Amino acid sequence: MTKYAKIIGTGSYLPPRRVTNQDLAAQLAEKGIETSDEWIFSRSGISARHWADPDVASSDLAVKAAEQAIEAAGIDRQSIDLILVATSTPDFVFPSTACIIQNKLGINNQCAAFDLQAVCSGFVYALATADKFIRSGSHRNVLVIGTEVFSRILDFNDRTTCVLFGDGAGAVVLSASDEPGILSTAMHSDGSHVGILCVPGNVHGGAIAGNAFLHMDGQAVFKLAVTVLDKVARETMAAAEIQPEQIDWLIPHQANIRIMQGTARKLGLPAERMIAVVHEHGNTSAASIPLALDAAVRDGRIRPGQTVLMEGVGGGFTWGAALLRM
């Protein structure tokens, strides 16, 4: 049985269209909705976000990120034997976005490919799932992707939510290894909180039934997120017998700088050991953690041998964490 699943390559992609808070304020003003750069930044830490063009799908963003990750890993893409895609904004109702990505990447080895939906916790859930497949010995090289086009489900009459989210994709290649990689993972959910963060629409009779825009009770999400993130981080560290002071980098879900800072503070980690890209990306849901990871790998902050704690929280309510050695 394989001992570890190790990240051997990372990649990311943001659509070219960058929308600043000033741009968004001007757009909303045309609808008679008031907001400002100061209002948005003071509540979220967000200065800008990237939005995909109307003809660009989640799979298109994912392919760009995956190409980078595969190149960084230095493997033949035909050796990938599982593709896991975390997304809440799939290309189609079905088939899975993972199958679409498999085809676009030209991976023709008939490997398994499926989507996983845990909203903003999605990448951590997918990473944990990939870890289990590799540790079982059934798979050796797994492509894990978080990709979202949340701009498609935003209600631009609701200034409390439409200013927060962006589009993007991040990817990693996990490979079977005798060297320490993923040390521990934890996943949790509580369906009694479905209503505080959701898109409650569905397809019926060939049309959207109900409300297909994102709804969020920001205060309820904030209160619950800070509590569960601290608990799951400690659970994951305890499972690996790691103390907070041994963590080199914290990569939280990039939702809101106040939630991110609150979690770091509870863990006793200084702000300079937290990877934060929320100011430039906004909340990219399942893409946020791999986007932040790739940025820090490529700029040299995260180096081989360092210990990284990832944690995410999202609609469901879902939350999870992964502790790994790079």
Curated annotation (Swiss-Prot):
Q: Which residue ranges are recorded for the region named ACP-binding?
A: 254-258
UniProt xrefs under CDD domains: KAS_III (cd00830)
UniProt superkingdom: Bacteria
Q: Where in the cell is it found?
A: Cytoplasm
Listed pathway(s) = Lipid metabolism; fatty acid biosynthesis
User: Catalyzes what?
Assistant: malonyl-[ACP] + acetyl-CoA + H(+) = 3-oxobutanoyl-[ACP] + CO2 + CoA
Q: Catalytic residues? A: C120, H253, N283
Which keywords fit this entry according to its UniProt record?
Answer: Acyltransferase, Cytoplasm, Fatty acid biosynthesis, Fatty acid metabolism, Lipid biosynthesis, Lipid metabolism, Multifunctional enzyme, Transferase
Q: Name one GO biological process term.
A: secondary metabolite biosynthetic process
* Gene3D superfamilies in the cross-refs: 3.40.47.10
What is the E.C. number? Answer: 2.3.1.180
Q: Its principal location?
A: cytoplasm
Keyword Acyltransferase annotated: yes
The molecular function terms of the Gene Ontology recorded here are: 3-oxoacyl-[acyl-carrier-protein] synthase activity; beta-ketoacyl-acyl-carrier-protein synthase III activity
Classification via InterPro entries = ACP_syn_III_C, ACP_syn_III_N, FabH, Thiolase-like
Q: What class of enzyme is it?
A: transferase
Family named by the database record: Belongs to the thiolase-like superfamily. FabH family.
Subunit comment for this entry?
Homodimer.
**Tell me, what does this protein do in biology?**
Catalyzes the condensation reaction of fatty acid synthesis by the addition to an acyl acceptor of two carbons from malonyl-ACP. Catalyzes the first condensation reaction which initiates fatty acid synthesis and may therefore play a role in governing the total rate of fatty acid production. Possesses both acetoacetyl-ACP synthase and acetyl transacylase activities. Its substrate specificity determines the biosynthesis of branched-chain and/or straight-chain of fatty acids.
Identify the PANTHER family for this entry.
3-OXOACYL-[ACYL-CARRIER-PROTEIN] SYNTHASE 3, BETA-KETOACYL-[ACYL-CARRIER-PROTEIN] SYNTHASE III
Listed NCBIfam families = fabH, PRK09352.1
Q: What is known of its domains?
A: The last Arg residue of the ACP-binding site is essential for the weak association between ACP/AcpP and FabH.
Q: What is this protein called?
A: Beta-ketoacyl-[acyl-carrier-protein] synthase III
From the UniProt record, report the name of the gene that encodes this protein: fabH
